[in-house]
UniProtKB/Swiss-Prot annotation:
PROSITE patterns: RADICAL_SAM
Residues holding [4Fe-4S] cluster: 34, 38, 41
GO molecular function, one term: catalytic activity
Name of the featured protein: Uncharacterized protein MJ0683
Length: 259
């Protein structure tokens, strides 16, 4: 865990915002910013509006959001969260996510995505919703690679175990395989590891617009990967090959995101 985090507490004006995320009508972001400090994160663009320093060094906490959403019946799918992780380490103390789940009208159609096994804490509340799906972002970053680009996130082993536990407890789950990067992600391996206990899958290829810092990192440390992503023709060929591979698998695919 990144202990050097600046916490900024604010009062939110409204609990949800409209979104263009496919399949969702609204997003809820009880936190903005992230302790995981992933080098490839697309949400770094939030630094334009929240100028508190380097991405990964601060988190905005909307401390009144559970009260704003209390007993509200929101029609349309809600995605939690688009510029944050609902189960980052400080959630253990603030419990915003848990209190939102307690307060929101349980008829809400909710989709949660996280990288943390802390999500298992709230299984009792998940079971009260009429429509809920809970996803874990899975990749096979490990060793020095994970230390470099996902320094403070839970291990993939913990995420996969959490995915399995959700499934065993009757909670609809999904694996969000991301970011898919040439030579660094083994999509077939991840599917093989998770298929027996995963209801459906999303796949996301690396967002090249997300971080110049990350592209530079790949260029310096993984030149073969960089050579592919920096060449439009080569990257498209790689994407097509991966898509063809996953479509041959006997799995439910809800979405494939190519930026």
């Amino acid at each position: 865990m990144n202990s050097k985090i600046e916490i900024i507490k604010i009062k939110a004006k409204k609990p949800i915002n409209p979104t263009k995320i496919p399949g969702a009508k609204y997003v809820i972001n009880q936190y903005i910013g992230c302790q995981y400090a992933c080098k490839y994160c697309y949400a770094r663009f939030m630094c334009k509006w929240y100028n508190y320093g380097k991405w990964g060094s601060w988190v905005v906490v909307k401390e009144n959001l559970p009260d704003l959403i209390k007993n509200k019946h929101i029609k349309g799918k809600i995605y939690m969260s688009s510029v944050s992780d609902a189960y980052r380490p400080i959630e253990k103390d603030f419990k915003l996510t848990r209190n939102i789940l307690k307060n929101i009208d349980k008829r809400a159609e909710l989709s949660i995505l996280t990288k943390s096994d802390l999500v298992l804490r709230d299984m009792d509340l998940f079971k009260k919703f009429s429509s809920i799906e809970v996803g874990l972002t899975i990749n096979n970053f490990e060793g020095n690679l994970k230390k470099d680009i996902e320094p403070f996130s839970p291990s993939n082993e913990k995420r996969i175990d959490a995915l399995k536990t959700l499934y065993e407890n009757g909670i609809k789950n999904y694996a969000f395989i991301s970011p898919i990067i040439p030579d660094l992600i083994d999509v077939e391996y991840i599917i093989g590891e998770t298929k027996p206990f995963t209801n459906f899958y999303y796949f996301e290829f690396l967002n090249l617009k997300a971080s110049r810092e990350f592209k530079h990192y790949l260029e310096q440390n993984y030149p073969e990967s960089y050579e592919i992503i920096s060449n439009k023709t080569a990257f498209k060929r790689y994407i097509d090959e991966v898509i063809n591979t996953i479509k041959k698998k006997d799995i439910a695919i809800k979405g494939i995101c190519v930026h």
